[in-house]
Amino acid sequence: MFEQTFRNIDDVLRKEAGCTTELDYTEQTSWLLFLKYLDDLEQERALEAELVGKAYEFIIDEAHRWSSWAAPKKPDGKVDHDHALIGPDLIDYVNRTLFPYLQGFKQRATSPDTIEYKIGEIFSEIKNRFQSGYSLRDALEYIDELRFKSQQEKHELSHLYEAKIKNMGNAGRNGGEYYTPRPLIRAMIQVVKPKIGDRIYDGACGSAGFLCESYEYLRQGNLTTKQLETLQNNTFTGKEKKSLAYVIAIMNMILHGIDAPNIIHTNTLTENLSDIQEKNRFDVIFANPPFGGKERPEVQQNFPIKTGETAFLFLQHFIKILKVGGRAGVVIKNTFLSNSDNASRALRQELLSSCKDRKSVV
């Protein structure tokens, strides 16, 4: 249904001088998709409110809604090219007016878990890379063909978006930071067997592959309304340091069916282990933490086992934040069990002593 539209968007991006890598293509597709999704969501909520005789308070001001600037329509439903911005006017509006307006939501939001805060965070962390307002106009019209109304439409969009993430992961450079092969993720989920009511966590979530696949695993069968609400609101938490990965994670979870993803833009390793309380702990942890990274000495001071290897720091964090009786599946490099350095030996001992009452798949 939407596969050709995604191909058309990619063709536009490949011809755009401001976009040169698969990471750029995914980034630009992501912010456009997000704004189209947000407009569809608001239109749906407004209609639902109208049906029960209530007024809906829009998040986005009318002048900056998708239907006003990206795809103004004629009465027959076709794009009104007489009123649609194009060329330098479109680029000027996006860079000087739209993005600053959207960035301002972060300061105006009442708390970090609101959609308003996430809007501000997303548009504070990415930028418009389109240099040609004609290319952007073409991309907008293709994006406008996409719909987020039905579960079937979201399902297809999620698969197409996952394909873009996979291409980005295979593109070299730092693309692998964003993508874990889905067969590996599904195998780990089958072993750990999360259940409805578990709180599931990934402290290095990348594109949120583990969280999305856990959602797909848990939503199978005939769930009650209460169970569906639990999945939507009280199950998944992700943390991500990289700006682009944060944006992709939110969009990926939205396309899989989580309306307000609890993805936090932060460096997990800067959190003090001694501050973690029982209420902060999780029943299930999935993660593929980055290997070979380095953290500043002051960050390493948060951990009892001092090491510059970020994967080992993440393991200590996961041990601390996993509930007693909890289960974890973590990808770790294959030399971990044979390395003879002090940090590896100490961490293996810590796993043996601290995880007797927890199940871990490493």
Language-model features: where?
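Conserved small/polar residues in nucleotide/adenosyl-binding loops
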Residues: 361-362
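Short glycine-dipeptide loop
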Residues: 322-328
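Hydrophobic C-terminal alpha-helix "anchor/cap" residues
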Residues: 143, 351-352
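Non-catalytic, mostly N-terminal accessory regions of nucleic-acid modification and defense proteins
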Residues: 1-196, 264-271
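Acceptor-substrate binding/catalytic loop of class I
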Residues: 336-340
